[in-house]
A protein has these predicted regions:
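Non-catalytic effector/regulatory segments
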Residues: 22, 50, 68-71
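Short loop/turn and capping residues at structural boundaries
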Residues: 32, 44, 61-62
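N-terminal, helix-rich and Lys/Arg-enriched segments in bacterial and organellar proteins
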Residues: 18-21, 48-49, 57
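Short amphipathic alpha-helical interface segments
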Residues: 9-35
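Short, cationic-aromatic polyanion-contact patches
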Residues: 3-14, 28, 58-71
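Glycine-centered, phosphate/nucleic-acid-interacting loop/turn motifs that mediate DNA/RNA or nucleotide
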Residues: 54
């Protein structure tokens, strides 16, 4: 039986989101979901992980939150 760690649970998905932002630039949650095929809660978990590591920026454009990699 393999054990799931927090690092593997969120870290893997954070890597997918980071790659999506790196390749596609600033994106909405919906954009990230389409590119990565992750569920909404997985994207939010990954963004939280990346945010905790200070690797992303968030900007409001109208009512939309746009996520990008920290420059």
């Amino acid at each position: 039986m393999t054990e799931t760690t927090v690092e593997s649970l969120f870290g893997e998905k954070a890597g997918l989101v980071w790659e999506a932002l790196d390749q596609n630039g600033p994106s909405t949650i919906g954009d990230i979901m389409k590119v990565t095929t992750l569920r909404r809660e997985e994207v939010y978990g990954a963004l939280g992980w990346l945010g905790r590591e200070n690797k992303i920026a968030v900007e409001m454009r109208g009512r939309a939150k746009i996520f990008s990699l920290q420059s």
